[in-house]
Amino acid sequence: MATSENDKRSKPSSLRSIIAGSTAGAVEIAITYPAEFAKTRSQLNRRLPDAKKLPWPPFGSQWYAGCTTLIIGNSLKAGIRFVAFDWLKSLLQDENGQISGPKTVIAGFGAGFTESLLAVTPFESIKTQLIDDRKSQNPRMRGFLHGSRVIFQERGVRGFFQGFVPTTARQAANSATRFSSYTMLKQMAQGYVAPGEKLGTASTFALGGIAGLITVYVTQPLDTVKTSRMQSLEASKNYKNSFVCAARIFKDEGIFTFWSGAVPRLARLIMSGGIVFTMYEKTMDALDGLDPERRYI
């Protein structure tokens, strides 16, 4: 009976995972979006000669172009990511509730694939095309809903899912790296606290930030190919597929170009890693306070 109760408390319900994950995702992107804008703009502008590069706008509303899209998308994808990871982790853990490093990586890959299919690819495609559209003298897209309609009219459903393979590869690697890094670091940190005691907010934030740093340098090449090949407005004319894109980048611009945009992405993912894991853990604690027996949530 005690074991059953412990299992129940160690395995959050799907609803609880969705609530905690979605809350964490919304707060994360609302705080870190300007760094995401800078990363995407630097990648999209690198194809232009110096004389045609647009100057960086003053910090303000233009830095939040596409923000509404990404807040909605990030909240959705974080909820999907955490519920998928928690579910897969519960399937892969042993009878004592423990999970090995390789199995954590597998759960992370599965979570990344799921969120890419259901949220990341369509929402990031819209976001990137909104930002790219603002490079023109006469932008045509007036926000999320209007931009979605323009994309559908001009490119059909493929306009939302073009780039699924590189995006999914990037997202699966992203989730696998982030979850496995955070889980490993958390297990190490818990060895320094009393049994049953939870890590503090500062410790959780620091561990999430370190996991974010590791994630950037592992997945940045996939992120660069995804943005260059699949989701700019001119991508279909410039590249046939992601492999051609990667080869062209390597040949024309050199290997270090794969890490273009790493610095602003580094700033965002260190912050977002700390924010998202801290918010997830704290939301779980708050839900425990509201429903300690986990009867309703």
Curated annotation (Swiss-Prot):
Protein name (database record): Mitochondrial citrate transporter A
Pfam families, sorted: Mito_carr
Transmembrane regions: 18-31, 61-81, 99-119, 160-180, 192-212, 251-272
UniProt Solcar repeat ranges: 12-91, 102-188, 199-286
Family: Belongs to the mitochondrial carrier (TC 2.A.29) family.
One GO BP: mitochondrial citrate transmembrane transport
Subcellular location: Mitochondrion inner membrane
Recorded GO MF terms: citrate secondary active transmembrane transporter activity
Membrane topology of the entry: Multi-pass membrane protein
Catalytic activity: citrate(in) + H(+)(in) = citrate(out) + H(+)(out)
Keywords, alphabetical: Membrane, Mitochondrion, Mitochondrion inner membrane, Repeat, Translocase, Transmembrane, Transmembrane helix, Transport
GO CC annotations, alphabetized: mitochondrial inner membrane
EC id: 7.-.-.-
PANTHER family noted in UniProt: SUCCINATE/FUMARATE MITOCHONDRIAL TRANSPORTER-RELATED, TRICARBOXYLATE TRANSPORT PROTEIN, MITOCHONDRIAL
Gene expressing this chain: ctpA
Species in which this protein is naturally found: Aspergillus niger (strain ATCC 1015 / CBS 113.46 / FGSC A1144 / LSHB Ac4 / NCTC 3858a / NRRL 328 / USDA 3528.7)
Phenotypic consequence of gene deletion: Results in the production of citric acid decreased by 15.8 and 18.3% at 3 and 5 days, respectively. Leads to fluffy and albino colonies, and reduced conidia formation, when all 6 genes ctpA to ctpF are deleted.
Free-text function comment from the UniProt entry: Mitochondrial transporter that mediates citrate export from mitochondria to cytoplasm. Both ctpA, ctpB, and ctpD play important roles in citric acid transport across the mitochondrial membrane and function in a redundant manner.
